[in-house]
């Protein structure tokens, strides 16, 4: 049933009020993106890239890094690799290829330097992008309750001292391995 002329349908009025409130709300600015307070902004990179071309960047920062990129003009896509300094859409470990904002979280265990490729999508002659590089200082919890990052600030590669029980179990394991090897040898000789 159509609404009488001169009077808008109730849902149209509600929709207009909702859109107006979204536009006028202070936190709706597209330029301001919310980030957790544990993140530290390291760099802001702006650039231009032609259609079908790559622009390459190198990341040397250690730790968990978050890349947030938005296309100011056109459509730029993001490719990341720990094994190649020139990642592409054929050779990458992480990627974000959306028509909107792109984001990639680079784990702390990725070997540095990390290669970053920004690809200009061929649907636009030229793309402009802005990439924000954040250090993610959040501490992830280990599934068994231990922190993923050492709490005392020790080097992540530092090994913890072994308990005496671990040493005796390791010795016992070596002895069993030797015993089984000798038994296999004896069985091969006999049969």
Curated annotation (Swiss-Prot):
A single GO CC term for this protein reads: extracellular region
The family assignment reads:
Belongs to the UPF0669 family.
Q: Which organism is it from?
A: Macaca fascicularis (Crab-eating macaque)
Starting at the broadest rank, the lineage of the source organism is: Eukaryota, Metazoa, Chordata, Craniata, Vertebrata
Q: Where is the signal peptide?
A: 1-30
User: At which residues is glycosylation annotated?
Assistant: 53
Biological process terms in GO annotation: apoptotic process
> Is Secreted given among the entry's keywords?
yes
The UniProt keyword set, sorted, is: Apoptosis, Glycoprotein, Secreted, Signal
User: Can the keyword Glycoprotein be found in this entry's annotation?
Assistant: yes
Annotated localization? Secreted
What this protein is reported to do is described as:
May be involved in induction of apoptosis in CD4(+) T-cells, but not CD8(+) T-cells or hepatocytes.
The protein's name is UPF0669 protein C6orf120 homolog
InterPro entries for this protein: UPF0669
């Amino acid at each position: 049933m159509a609404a009488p002329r001169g009077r808008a349908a109730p849902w149209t009025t509600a929709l207009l009020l909702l859109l107006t409130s979204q536009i006028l709300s202070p936190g709706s600015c597209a330029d301001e993106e919310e980030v957790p307070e544990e993140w530290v902004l390291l760099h802001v990179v702006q650039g231009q890239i032609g259609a079908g071309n790559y622009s390459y960047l190198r990341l040397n920062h250690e730790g968990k890094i978050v890349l947030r990129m938005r296309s100011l003009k056109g459509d730029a896509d993001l490719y990341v690799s720990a094994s190649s300094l020139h990642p592409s859409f054929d050779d990458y470990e992480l990627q974000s290829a959306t028509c909107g904002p792109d984001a990639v979280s680079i784990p702390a265990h990725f070997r540095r330097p990390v290669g970053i490729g920004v690809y200009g999508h061929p649907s636009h002659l030229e793309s402009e992008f802005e990439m924000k590089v954040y250090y993610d200082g959040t501490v992830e919890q280990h599934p068994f309750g231990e922190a993923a990052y050492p709490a005392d600030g020790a080097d992540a590669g530092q090994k913890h001292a072994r308990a005496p029980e671990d040493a005796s179990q390791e010795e016992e394991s070596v002895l069993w391995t030797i015993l089984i090897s000798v038994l296999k040898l004896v069985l091969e000789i006999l049969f």
